[in-house]
């Protein structure tokens, strides 16, 4: 589906929604340091569907090292930061770039200046791996 943007916000219908914390895709609080999460979907159930959320890292924010519970993609929408995977080597990442983590892969994300990312998790996200 193609979306057409207009110059007037009044011309664009906007659907606002929210999920109760018990039914929203939000990681455990102990993983987040100065990171806010805006869930876009309900959690995946038994790997049968995908889940997504916007993560906003404040300057100095960090998603601490942890294993991916299911395959996931982190796509940076704005800002920049650093990511590390199973090898623990930190690499820079910036707006327009994405990283894939396999199920069980240890990883971490941080930002000294602030970063906004879309995180998509689900059994099928690995099919997008390697695409431009």
Which residue stretches match the model-derived regions?
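A short, N-terminal "cap"/entry segment at the start of jelly-roll beta-barrel domains
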Residues: 1-49, 131-132
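Short beta-strand His + acidic residue motifs that chelate non-heme Fe in jelly-roll/DSBH
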Residues: 63-65, 83-84, 101, 106-112, ...
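Conserved short histidine dyad/triad with adjacent acidic residue
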Residues: 38, 51-68, 103
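A cytosolic small-molecule/anion-sensing beta-strand core signal
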Residues: 77-78, 94, 113
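Short acidic-glycine-tyrosine-enriched beta hairpin
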Residues: 87-104
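Short, conserved beta-strand element in jelly-roll/cupin
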Residues: 56-58, 67-83
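A short hydrophobic beta-strand segment most commonly corresponding to one strand
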Residues: 100, 113-130
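Short, surface-exposed secondary-structure edge patches
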Residues: 54, 73, 89-91
């Amino acid at each position: 589906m193609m979306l057409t943007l207009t110059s007037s916000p009044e011309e664009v219908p906007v659907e606002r929604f929210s999920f109760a914390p018990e039914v929203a895709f939000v990681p455990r609080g102990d993983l987040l340091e100065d990171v806010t999460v805006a869930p876009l979907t309900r959690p995946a159930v038994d790997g049968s569907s995908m889940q997504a959320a916007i993560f906003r890292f404040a300057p100095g924010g960090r998603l601490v090292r942890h294993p991916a519970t299911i395959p996931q993609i982190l796509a940076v929408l704005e800002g920049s930061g650093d990511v590390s995977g199973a090898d623990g080597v930190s690499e820079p990442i910036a707006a327009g770039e994405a990283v894939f983590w396999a199920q069980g892969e240890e990883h971490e994300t941080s930002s000294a200046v602030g970063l906004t990312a879309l995180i998509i998790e689900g059994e099928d996200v690995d099919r997008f791996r390697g695409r431009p």
